[in-house]
Amino acid sequence: MKDFYQYFQFLFFFMLSVISFSLFVALTPLSNVFVFFVFNLLGQILLNVFSFLSFYLIVYPIVNWYAYKKHIFTKRFIFNWNYTVILFFTLIFLIKINSNVEKSYFIKIFLINFGIVLGNFFIFTLLILEFVVWIYLNYVFFKDVNFILDTFKFLEFKIKILFENILSYFPFSNSLDVKKDIKVYGDSVDDLKDSQVFDEKKNIINDEEYQALWSFSAFLRNNKKPSNINLDKTIFEGSDLKEASSLNKDILNENALNLDENVDEIDESCEYKYLDNLEDNKLVISGKVKACEIRTKGIISQVAISHVYNENVALNKKNDSYVIDISVFDQKEIKNDVEDIEYDKEIQKQSMILQETLKEFNINAKLIDIIKGPVVTMYAVRPDKGIKLSKITSISDNIALRLAAIRVRIIAPIPGREAVGIEIPNKRREFILISEIIDSKEFRGDFRIPFALGKEISGENIVFDLVNSPHLLIAGATGAGKSVCVNSLIASIIFSKSPDEVKLIMIDPKIVELKLFNDIPHLLTPVITDVKRALEALRWCLDEMERRYVLLDNLLVRDISSYNKKIKDENLNLMILPYLVIIIDEFADLILSARKDLENLISRLAAMARAVGIHLVLATQRPSVDVITGVIKANFPSRISFMVASSMDSRIILGSSGAEKLLGKGDMLYISSLNPFPXRIQGGFLKEREVYRLVEEVKKFGSPNYIDDEIFIDSVKEPDLVALGPSDEPMFDEALEIVKTTRKASASYLQRRLKIGYNRAARIIEIMEDMGYVGPVNGSKPREVLI
């Protein structure tokens, strides 16, 4: 429709030009010579032109209304174009008045005939008034007075395009030899200067090639193909123009992007550009770009993707004995190409409305990049010099109103770029499955405790190592995706790491959230739901931390990685220390019940436990200052914030606002010690049935060895029974028989079986150890039964 509108306008001006030329010839002294040819040979043409003109005047308002309604052009463009039509009609009226005189000499009649003089005066006055009104309306509505120069430049550009198209039909001319000078703006001053123009023909591309390359880079980015393209700072050589049948398919088959086998059947009336031989090798993948309708479609179609690496059977891990099939997770369905085309049209429409809105508030800015994400699309704009960033951020609600968006988030500026980012929610939201991140090359990296977080706005999979965090704080309102994020963290760990590599302690005051993971071999204790038991578990972790520090000191190493490496390299007769992750799902319920004890335990663990491989993950839905205290924030540099109610809550979590503008359902902001600027990420969605399948698979690798029974003291107090030996303990023989039968030497186990107090059961175990029936305490391992 966009091309039709342009041709419609061109036809109208062509008709007016023919009429103007004919009337002008009739007014000149040469009319005696040309009058016969003009009114006889062109008579039929003019008759047809006037006939069509009457039809045009009827259709003209409808076409303009449709162009505005569908956002084919901006309001400013349509307004100025149509105002030009009004001026053209005025000029035609001027010539028509003078053409009524029968004499041939224009000046003579102009001086004699008073009516003609009065008519000319009226028309000239009307022209001046129209120009004044034109300038005034552009200043009032669009805050722009340079539109006349822009209009002339645009007309000059379209005339060049017209002549190139005309010359391309002649065999002795090639339209691609006529190259246009385009302005290339660089992000770095060292590379390119603003408004710098390159005149060398080999370094200049025309407008169609630029649009094709821009779309091609977007196509590569959306389909996860390697590319390092920045059209704002890269100059490409001219591309060759070839027919579809003359493409060398052997060359294309060597690349990651291949043509469809039925490429010859695709729209043979359209020319294709074959992109290769690009300067600096910035684009090393060749492809076939559809040159016609590149602006309306906005994507490169008819390019088939060859999946080079697709592994659906199993994920290889360092521990070959611990392998879990990726099929336990739901797999993503194939995208619909029709939806992608509609999505690209929607993006073009939004970009035009966004630029109009900025103009309405007298903000001159250039749209330099569009980054399409699964949930939001970020429009990167470069404001003119002297524009305050606060002026842009203050109109976020107006932008949301014009675009009918739920929330609009503005990043002013984008870190590392000379631009402001405006994030607008997509009309059609794309859900990210956890399998997309786990079954990616990013997840196959060398991670000690991997966490498949999600996808950022550019489509890149985000996976980070919890060891480098070293602790993680997760906060967000109810239903924003916090619990799913915690489940994704646990799923990432137990999917990729064996129980010998990572151990887990889960504390769930809400009782129902983490119960699904009970009985997996990674657990050191069943999922804890009681506050007192949670405190005892954290005290045990503190003792375990001190024990590990003693082990590290004995080997003269600084951290757990060096400790395990030294054991392997020197074949020492010592046990490898597994990493320990403590996950607390609802931290607010715990800290409000036992603030002093819990805060001291958390602070000590967060400050000292990272070196010995103990890491904390705290999640809460109440981001208040009495829950997330300054001491906790200081020891948790890595934080995730989902949607919150207010900017105050966002500042408590992240230290800055922005989380209140999130959309929920996994939409998050993530900061870390390596990247303190909040990065927007869409979290992976994990269904409950996927958790069930994963847990059942993990249980096949063994049962849990709960050693935490000894750390929980029974709340029922009874008088201490001091026993010096087996003869002094009447229940010793029964306890020894239980240990011999069950092969479990645990004080809390005897406590439950014999229904006695913890102190008494612990004393019985000590007597067994002294007599050589059971082994000593062996760290996180259960006691060895020697009988």
Curated annotation (Swiss-Prot):
Residues of the FtsK domain: 459-651
- Pfam families with a match to the protein in the record: FtsK_alpha (PF17854), FtsK_gamma (PF09397), FtsK_SpoIIIE (PF01580)
> Which SMART domains does the entry mention?
Ftsk_gamma
One cellular component term (GO) for this entry is: plasma membrane
Membrane spanning residue stretches: 10-30, 33-53, 77-97, 109-129
Q: Which residues bind ATP?
A: 479-484
What GO terms are given for molecular function?
ATP binding; DNA binding
Q: How does it sit in the membrane?
A: Multi-pass membrane protein
> Which InterPro entries does this UniProt record tie to the protein?
FtsK/SpoIIIE/SftA (IPR050206), FtsK_alpha (IPR041027), FtsK_dom (IPR002543), Ftsk_gamma (IPR018541), P-loop_NTPase (IPR027417), WH-like_DNA-bd_sf (IPR036388), WH_DNA-bd_sf (IPR036390)
Subcellular location, principal: membrane
Where it sits in the cell: the answer is: Cell inner membrane
Give the similarity note: Belongs to the FtsK/SpoIIIE/SftA family.
- Domain comment (free text): Consists of an N-terminal domain, which is sufficient for the localization to the septal ring and is required for cell division, followed by a linker domain, and a C-terminal domain, which forms the translocation motor involved in chromosome segregation. The C-terminal domain can be further subdivided into alpha, beta and gamma subdomains. The alpha and beta subdomains form the DNA pump, and the gamma subdomain is a regulatory subdomain.
Subunit annotation: Homohexamer. Forms a ring that surrounds DNA.
Q: What is this protein called?
A: DNA translocase FtsK
Q: What organism, scientifically named, is this protein from?
A: Borreliella burgdorferi (strain ATCC 35210 / DSM 4680 / CIP 102532 / B31) (Borrelia burgdorferi)
